[in-house]
C-alpha cells in the first residue's frame, strides 16, 4: 500500500556519509497583523529514500531522514515483504548525494517472493500503489486482530496531550505527522515523526517490532486522518486500537470493523468519536 516515486539515479556523496538534517533554516518574509517582518523559519526536510533488498532497489519514497532503520523494518512488515522481523538480517543506511539508500538483507524466501512481485509489475509505467499488481491485492483483508486492550477514554485523550509535547520536529517546523504507542498504563512509550503520515506509522511499526512492547494491550495514536492504509498498517502491527485526531474514511471504518480494530477519530480534550468496536474504550457516561 505504498505511494512512491520513480527511482532516481543516485551517486555516492563526495562529502561522506554524514546524516542529513531533519530540518533547515530559511530567511522568510512573515506577514502578521498588518506588518511585514523578515525572520528565520525552520522548515522540515524530506529526501528520497530508496529501499534496497538484497541489492535490488524496490521503491523510492520521500521521507524525513530520521529513524530510517525503523522505517525500513516497519515498511517491510506492513507491506508483507517479510512476515516477521527476524527475516530482516541487517539494515544499513547509505547517505548519497541525491538521497539515502537503505540496504536491507532479508531471508532468501522473502526475497524470492519479492522478486516474483517485481516480475509481475515489469513493463508497467506510472507509480500509484507501487508494488501492488491487482485490485484484489490492494483490498486485501487482514486476519482479525486479537487484542485485550482496554482504555478509559480519558486516558486516550490525555495521551494525545503527551504526544503533542513530544513532537519535537513538529514544534520546530509545523510540517510533520506523528505516530505513537500508548501502553496499557497510559504512558506514551514510543513516538515517531515524518512528513508523511504513512511513513510515521511505518517507523512506529519498525520500532515496535524490535522493542519488546506488549502489542496485545496497547494502542496506536496518529496525528492525522485515519485512512484505509493506516488501519491496514495497524492490523499488520497487531494493535487492537487506532485513535486519530482527524476523521477516518468510510473504507477505513469498514476495514476496522472487519479486522476487529477499535477505531476512534476526532480525539480532543473531552471529546472523541468511535467508529468501530467501541468495547475497548471505557467511560462512565451512558449513551445519549
Swiss-Prot record:
Main location: cytoplasm
GO CC annotation: cytoplasm
The entry's keywords: Cytoplasm, Molybdenum cofactor biosynthesis
Pfam families: FdhD-NarQ
Region feature (Disordered): 1-23
GO molecular function: sulfur carrier activity; sulfurtransferase activity
Gene3D superfamilies registered for this protein in UniProt: 3.10.20.10, Cytidine Deaminase, domain 2
Domain of life assignment: Bacteria
InterPro entries (UniProt xref): Cytidine_deaminase-like, FdhD
Expression induction: Induced by formate.
Catalytic residue positions: 127
GO biological process terms held by the UniProt record: Mo-molybdopterin cofactor biosynthetic process
Chain coiled-coil ranges: none
Localization per Swiss-Prot or TrEMBL: Cytoplasm
PANTHER family linked to this entry: FORMATE DEHYDROGENASE, SULFUR CARRIER PROTEIN FDHD
UniProt family annotation: Belongs to the FdhD family.
Record-linked NCBIfam families: fdhD_narQ
Role summary: Required for formate dehydrogenase (FDH) activity. Acts as a sulfur carrier protein that transfers sulfur from IscS to the molybdenum cofactor prior to its insertion into FDH.
Protein name (record): Sulfur carrier protein FdhD
Gene (name only): fdhD
